[in-house]
Amino acid sequence: MEIFDYDNVLLLPRKCRVESRSECDASVTLGQRSFRLPVVPANMKTVVDEKICRWLASNGYFYVMHRFDLDNVQFVRDMHAAGCFASISLGVKQPDYDTVDRLVAEGLCPEYITIDIAHGHADTVKAMIAYLKQHLPQAFVIAGNVATPEAIIDLENWGADATKVGVGPGKVCITKLKTGFGTGGWQLSALKWCARVATKPIIADGGIRSHGDIAKSIRFGATMVMIGSLFAGHEESPGKTVEVDGEQFKEYYGSASDFNKGEYKHVEGKRILEPIKGRLADTLVEMEQDVQSSISYSGGRRLMDIRKVNYVILGGDNAGEHLLM
C-alpha cells in the first residue's frame, strides 16, 4: 500500500473547460440535502456552538453540533423552531440512549446523527446504530471514527449511512503519541484505502491544514471533509479569547483533552492558541472560491470531477505509477 499524506501529494491539472471558476459547482449532497461546500466544521466545543450551527444551517452549509455540556433534545427543538435542520452528536453510553428515548417521546427526529467516539470500530457503536435505526429510522446516521477498510465494511453493514475516517491526525490530537495507533502522518492514504471498499459517503476527519487539502480529500474518496483548526479562531468561535504580546488568540483544544473533560483522565488531545482569523463567513467564501479553482484545474465543472485527475507523490521515484488510478 502506498503511504502518503496531504503534504507530499499534488494533483495534476487537466485541460480547463470553463472561462471562470465561478462556473464550477462546489456543492455536495449528503443524505436528503445539498450543501454549498464539502466541508463541515469539527464538532468540537472550541469550533461550533448553537449560534454558529444555526448560521451555517441557514446559509446552506452542513454542520455537526458537539455533544459536550449540551441538551441535545432542546437543541433539536430550537433548530427546528428556527426552520433549520438538526444535526447532533451522540456517544455510546447510557445518557446517549436516554437522549434517543427523549427525542422519540417528544416526537423529534434530528435529520443527522453522528455517533462520535475516538475508536468507532466497536460493538458499542454497532449497538447504538441498531438502536437509532429502530427508534429514529428517518435520521441519517454518520458513524466513526475509523481507519481501516474492515471498519468501513462493518459500519456500513451495521446500518451507518456514512462513515467518518481519521484516528488522531488532527492538529490538537495526540492519540498517536499516547497510544501508538492512528492515521496521523498517513491520513490521505487511509482515506484512499477505506474509500476502495466504501459504498456510502465518507467524511474525512482531521489533518486538513490548507484549502487545497479539501480537493485532495475529494480526489481520494471523501464526500465531505471535517475541519477543526482552520475553522477555530474566528471572531465568532466559542473558544476563549487570549491576548499574548498584544496579539489576540482563541483557545482550540481536542475533544479528548483535559481542557474539554475538565479533568486529567485519559487525555488524547491538547490545547493550542489560534490567531484570530476574522469572520467565519469570509473564510467560507474563500474556501468556496478555492474549491471552485480546484474543480477548474481538474478540467471539470462539478466537485466530483476532481476524482478523475492523476497525482504525484513527492519524493517518490516518478509520477507514472500514479497515472489513471
From Swiss-Prot:
GO biological process, one term: purine nucleotide metabolic process
Catalytic residue list: 173 (thioimidate intermediate)
Binding site for NADP(+): 202-225
Catalyzed reactions: IMP + NH4(+) + NADP(+) = GMP + NADPH + 2 H(+)
Entry annotated with the keyword Lipid metabolism: no
GO-annotated molecular function: GMP reductase activity
Enzyme Commission numbers on file: 1.7.1.7
Gene3D superfamilies hit by this protein: Aldolase class I
Top-rank taxon, per record: Bacteria
EC class: oxidoreductase
Cellular component GO terms held in the UniProt record: cytosol; GMP reductase complex
Keyword check for Membrane: no
Entry keywords, A to Z: NADP, Oxidoreductase
Function: Catalyzes the irreversible NADPH-dependent deamination of GMP to IMP. It functions in the conversion of nucleobase, nucleoside and nucleotide derivatives of G to A nucleotides, and in maintaining the intracellular balance of A and G nucleotides.
UniProt record similarity statement: Belongs to the IMPDH/GMPR family. GuaC type 2 subfamily.
Identification of the protein by name: GMP reductase
Species of the source: Paracidovorax citrulli (strain AAC00-1)
Gene expressing this chain: guaC
